[in-house]
Design a protein with these regions (language model features):
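Conserved beta-strand segments of the P-loop GTPase G domain that flank and frequently precede/overlap
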Residues: 41-44, 66-69, 107-109, 307-310, ...
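C-terminal-of-GTPase-core extension/linker across diverse P-loop GTPases
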Residues: 3-38, 161-235, 241-242, 332-466
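Conserved nucleotide-binding/hydrolysis micro-motifs of P-loop NTPases
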Residues: 46-47, 71-72, 111-114, 133-137, ...
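N-terminal accessory targeting/assembly segments
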Residues: 1-137
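Short alpha-helix plus adjacent loop in nuclease-associated cores
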Residues: 134-152
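Conserved C-terminal guanine-recognition region of P-loop GTPase G domains, centered on the G4
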Residues: 53-55, 91-100, 111-126, 269, ...
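Switch II of P-loop NTPase G domains
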Residues: 18-30, 50-53, 72-92, 278-301, ...
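Switch I (effector-binding) loop of TRAFAC-class P-loop GTPase G-domains
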Residues: 219-225, 243-270, 281-294
Length: 466
C-alpha cells in the first residue's frame, strides 16, 4: 500500500507519493494497530535476526518469508538490483493461493539509509520499514501520554525528513520525475512544514523538560532521594518498580511497553523515590534516542542508578545487552564532567528473572557482570519474590550508608513523643524501634544526613543521635 502525502496550501492541494511508511508527515492519525499484518523480511549475509524478529512479534506482524542474499548490503538498494527485482516480481504475483497473499509490508533487517529505503519502496510498491521505522511504529503503538507521543512524533519527523530530502535530491539530479507538477519546490515546501512542526514540538518538549527538572529540584530540597532503574528493554524494570513501589505501571512481557518515566515512592519509605523509564536497545541511532532525552534524564539524574539485566538471556545475548546498556548510559549523561565522574556515582547491578536458572548458570552470569565493572551483582526474582529484601537493603545502604540509631526523649512538657516519632517516619525508613521504661524511644532508621540534621535541629533537644 502506497502512502500519500498531502501538502495543504492556501490555494492548492498537490499530492505527493512518498516513501511508504513515512508516517510522520502524513496528515491524520498514524496507524497504531499492526496485529495480523503480513510481511516479508529481507536479510543480507548471516546476520542474527533474533532481536529484530522479537520486535516484529511484539507488533503482532507475521513474517511470511525471510529472504536472504549473501554478501555485504548494496549501498543503493540493500539487496542487489537483480535480487530486488525478483522480490518485486514475486510481490506482483501475490494473488489468491500465492504464499505471499496478503503481504503489504517489506521489512529490511538494518538501519537503512534514505537512499536504500526509497529504492526498496520504488521497487516493491508496498510499505517499507527498516529497523528504525519498525521501532518508531512500535513506539507509536505504545505512546499513551502526551509526553510519549511528543517524543515519538519528533523521532518520526526527524526520520521522515531524511527521506524527503533524499526524494528532493533525486528529483534535482534527475533520478526521478517530479511529483504532482510541483517537483523539488513542492517537496521543499513539505520539508519546511516538517521543520516548523519539529520546532513547535521541541518547544513543547523543552517546556516539559524544564518542568521535570524543577520537580527534581523540589524533591532534592525536600530531602527525598531518587533511585533510577535502567536497563535493556524488557529487563524487568517495570515489574520491579511495581513490586517495590506499589504504583501501577504497564507490565507486559513485550519490548518497549514503557516509553515515559514513572516516579513512585518506595513502599516502606516516603523519602526514597523510584524512577522507571524507557529501556535501551542496541544500534538505535543517537538522533532517535535523543528525542527521549528528557525521559531518560528523569531516571539517570538520580542518587542511585540500578542497572537491571535479564538473566534468562543466552550468554552471548546477555553480554551484548549489558554492553549496550553501559554504552547508552555513558552516552546519555548531559555533560563531560558527569561522564568523567561516572565511576564515582552510586551505581549497582541486579540480575532479574533468576527463578529459572540453575546455580551454575547464575554463577556464570554474575561472573560476566563482574567483568563489566559491577563487583557485587544481586540476583532477584519479582515473580517468586526471591532476593527482594536483600535488594532493598542494598539500595538503602548505597543511599544512606549504615543505619542511624536515634533516641526520642519523653517529656510531659511541649510536643508529644508520638509527634516526633511521626517526623522520623516522614524523614526516613524505620528498621526497628524500642520503647524504654522511662518512655523514651530508641529508633534504628535509614536516613540521609540532610534529613537527620533537620530532625535534630527542629526537635528542641528532644532527638539525640546515638
Amino acid at each position: 500500500m502506497r502512502m500519500t502525502l498531502r501538502l495543504f496550501m492556501a490555494k492548492q492541494e498537490p499530492n505527493f507519493e512518498v516513501l511508504a511508511g513515512a508516517g510522520g508527515v502524513a496528515l491524520g492519525e498514524a496507524r497504531t494497530n499492526h496485529e495480523g499484518r503480513k510481511a516479508i523480511l529481507l536479510i543480507r549475509g548471516q546476520e542474527d535476526t533474533t532481536e529484530f524478529e522479537s520486535l516484529i512479534k511484539t507488533m503482532g506482524i507475521v513474517i511470511v518469508e525471510s529472504i536472504y542474499q549473501p554478501g555485504e548490503q548494496d549501498p543503493k538498494g540493500y539487496f542487489g538490483k537483480g535480487r530486488l527485482q525478483d522480490v518485486s516480481d514475486e510481490l506482483r504475483l501475490r494473488v489468491a493461493g500465492h504464499p505471499w497473499q496478503g503481504v503489504d509490508l517489506v521489512l529490511i533487517h538494518t538501519n537503512a539509509t534514505p537512499r536504500q529505503l526509497v529504492a526498496v519502496s520504488d521497487a516493491t510498491k508496498v510499505e517499507v520499514w527498516d529497523r528504525v521505522r519498525l521501532l518508531l511504529s512500535l513506539f507509536n503503538a505504545h505512546a499513551n501520554s502526551l509526553e510519549a507521543r511528543t517524543q515519538v512524533r519528533i523521532a518520526r519527523l526527524q526520520s521522515d525528513r531524511t527521506v524527503l530530502r533524499e526524494l528532493a535530491n533525486q528529483t534535482t539530479t534527475g533520478e526521478r520525475a517530479g511529483y504532482g507538477g510541483g517537483g523539488v519546490t513542492a517537496l521543499q515546501a513539505v520539508i519546511a512544514n516538517v521543520n516548523r512542526e519539529l520546532t513547535s514540538l521541541r518547544k513543547r518538549q523543552k517546556k516539559h523538560s524544564k518542568a521535570q527538572a524543577e520537580r527534581r529540584r523540589q524533591r532534592t530540597r525536600s530531602g527525598a532521594v531518587t533511585v533510577g532503574f535502567a536497563g535493556y528493554t524488557n529487563a524487568g524494570k517495570s515489574s520491579l518498580f511495581l513490586k517495590m513501589s506499589g504504583k501501577e505501571v504497564l507490565v507486559e512481557d513485550k519490548l518497549f511497553s514503557t516509553l515515559e518515566t514513572t516516579v513512585g515512592r518506595l513502599a516502606a519509605s516516603p523519602r526514597v523515590l523510584l524512577a522507571d523509564t524507557i529501556g535501551f536497545i542496541d544500534n538505535l541511532p543517537s538522533a532517535t534516542l535523543d528525542a527521549f532525552r528528557a525521559t531518560l534524564s528523569e531516571a539517570l539524574e538520580c542518587d542511585l542508578l540500578v542497572v537491571l539485566v535479564d538473566a534468562t538471556d543466552p550468554v552471548r545475548e546477555f553480554e551484548r545487552k549489558i554492553s549496550a546498556t553501559q554504552r547508552e548510559i555513558n552516552a546519555r549523561y548531559l555533560n563531560q564532567d558527569e561522564l568523567e565522574n561516572l565511576d564515582e556515582r552510586k551505581i549497582m547491578c541486579a540480575l532479574t528473572k533468576i527463578e529459572s536458572l540453575t546455580t551454575e548458570q547464575l554463577a556464570e552470569k554474575k561472573s560476566i557482570v563482574k567483568r563489566h565493572g559491577y563487583p557485587s551483582p544481586l540476583a532477584i526474582s519479582v515473580h517468586q519474590e526471591i532476593g527482594l529484601e536483600q535488594f532493598q537493603d542494598a539500595m538503602l545502604k548505597q543511599l544512606f550508608g549504615k543505619t542511624v540509631t536515634i533516641k526520642l526523649l519523653n517529656s510531659e512538657a511541649g510536643r508529644s513523643i508520638e509527634g516526633y516519632l511521626s517526623d522520623v517516619y516522614e524523614s526516613g525508613m524505620i528498621i526497628n524501634k524500642q520503647l524504654e521504661k522511662n518512655g523514651d524511644i530508641l529508633v534504628e532508621v535509614w536516613i540521609n544526613q540532610q534529613s537527620l540534621a533537620r530532625l535534630v535541629s527542629n526537635s528542641n533537644g528532644r532527638i539525640e543521635v546515638k
